Amino acid sequence: MKVFIGYVSLSGNTEKMAINIKNRMKAVGCEVYMERLDTVEVDALKDFDLAFIGLYTWNLEELPYEANEFYEEIDQVDFAGVKVAFFGAGDLTHSKPCAAIDILSNKMKQFGFDVYDQVLKIHHESSTYEQLSKCEDFAEHVLIWGSNRKKWRFFMWDRMLGSPKYQKSVFLLRRVLDDYPIKYKGRSKKRGTYTRTSEIRDF
């Protein structure tokens, strides 16, 4: 799966997030390309299965100047169906945190991009460990959403279900699900009787 990561960073925080996402994507076998947005031709995004865009916000509510050309070129190409997810670091105490992300994502939606409905916004004073953890989780969920191939979705769910950091929540979820019957192919059964693949499909 080909993944593009484009970013602009002023203090280095958004760049760190981009690197963390890149490392996670490579770890699961994706072919990853990462570049600064001010060096990218917008129409190149059509060559990728999935894109991540990372931005800082200038003057609390403005698009950074490095992303202006990228922003202006969006309306020149048909991007129907191109999948993209957004991330960035900024002042989350502000009334419009990471506003540049909202500005760019809104325009990309208008011109056909399939935009992931969750945005990863990290406070600019967050610890490196917190950034790493959130970026890894975000990258995994975006990959599941963006993949058209079942083997990728099953692979990522299997990694999450087997990961120590998810074991407690998965255990509790299974306890709840096992207590309630569900209808599957016209019959009522306990979820606990299904195979692992069926559980993944039902989630």
Task: Describe the residue ranges of each PLM region.
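Aromatic side chains
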Residues: 7, 48, 56, 70-71, ...
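FMN-binding flavodoxin-like domain, especially the glycine-rich phosphate-binding loop
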Residues: 16, 24, 28, 33-35, ...
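Short acidic active-site motifs
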Residues: 39-44
